[in-house]
């Protein structure tokens, strides 16, 4: 069970949510109604809330809410009520949680019909008194209903369907990622614009506003192509603009992140860049075939790509006339001038007069 007090990124997914509000003076009925309203999106079916007294004289409220669809949130403050922050847990055994709540309540409120945890198929097939062996569909339905995390889901599959787990692990990992998606951590720019003091040409500033800084996915973006010498700071500048996918040497679609603003293709020869038209053209949806992986649909939301190339691997020199026409129509082309840099040179200390 995952507590909201963890320092790790918070994630909660469960149809049975157990909440504890320390030192909360509100009535169980009032708290129950507030929790019921908070969970309205997932269709509440049952709630019980009780006040408990501790030996030190303090009181707390315990609540169990059951919903038709699993409550899903990455906001650790989602269940906060009037400044009172609860401990949030997935009630793996709602029967035991309900027994605990109703043990010695000072006040209690209940609404709806309690749903006991369904008897799990897991491990029952080996018992001699089992009515019949459950089907794989029944086993997977049971696992999906009870799993509360990616790790628990995969562990239950491994225990219940060992052969399928060993031969189809990739598919189970895919479904686990869909059921329990990773939490997007807060983006910390590894290349802030002030370290070093980065700068760019005025014409590129005009490109930045509509294509990077404006989150209008209804209009089709334009990409940016920069060609010039090495060690000029163009990669550092490109990576300073915000959250992005970064590819060097090859385009690895298995690491593609949809929650980005733009893509960067850095020092990859034209002939080794698959789907270059889709990237340059900021196409909204297309299918790619990652190496050693299954085909996947990429939904770009018209995401621009910044292509960085050194002069000796200029993409435009490798293109056919038709390819170059498409490239120029969908991409701003910027050729660096001799001696041009993407950062301000450090100030030299004043020299002492002799």
Curated annotation (Swiss-Prot):
Binding site for a divalent metal cation: 52, 62, 104
A molecular-function term among this protein's GO annotations: endodeoxyribonuclease activity, producing 5'-phosphomonoesters
Binding of ATP, residues: 228-235
Motif RCR-1 in this chain: 18-21
Every CRESS-DNA virus Rep endonuclease domain range: 11-114
Cofactor binding mode and count: Divalent metal cations, possibly Mg(2+) or Mn(2+).
GO biological process, one term: DNA replication
Region Transactivation, annotated ranges: 251-269
A matching Pfam family: Gemini_AL1
Example of a GO cellular component annotation carried by this entry: host cell nucleus
Keyword Ubl conjugation: no
Top-level taxon in the UniProt lineage: Viruses
Short sequence motif RCR-2: positions: 60-65
Residue span of region Oligomerization: 175-187
Motif (RCR-3): 100-103
Keywords per UniProt: ATP-binding, Covalent protein-DNA linkage, DNA replication, DNA-binding, Endonuclease, Helicase, Host nucleus, Hydrolase, Metal-binding, Multifunctional enzyme, Nuclease, Nucleotide-binding, Nucleotidyltransferase, Repressor, Transferase
Subcellular location: Host nucleus
Active-site residues, record numbering mapped to chain: 100 (for dna cleavage activity)
UniProt short sequence motif Nuclear localization signal, positions renumbered to this chain: 291-302
Named cofactor requirement(s): Mg(2+); Mn(2+)
SUPFAM superfamilies, sorted: Origin of replication-binding domain, RBD-like (SSF55464), P-loop containing nucleoside triphosphate hydrolases (SSF52540)
EC number in record: 2.7.7.-, 3.1.21.-
Entry domain remark: There are 3 rolling circle replication (RCR) motifs. RCR-2 is probably involved in metal coordination. RCR-3 is required for phosphodiester bond cleavage for initiation of RCR.
Function: Essential for the replication of viral ssDNA. The closed circular ssDNA genome is first converted to a superhelical dsDNA. Rep binds a specific region at the genome origin of replication. It introduces an endonucleolytic nick within the conserved sequence 5'-TAATATTAC-3' in the intergenic region of the genome present in all geminiviruses, thereby initiating the rolling circle replication (RCR). Following cleavage, binds covalently to the 5'-phosphate of DNA as a tyrosyl ester. The cleavage gives rise to a free 3'-OH that serves as a primer for the cellular DNA polymerase.
Family from the record: Belongs to the geminiviridae Rep protein family.
Protein name per its UniProtKB record: Replication-associated protein
Native source organism of the sequence: Maize streak virus genotype C (isolate Set) (MSV)
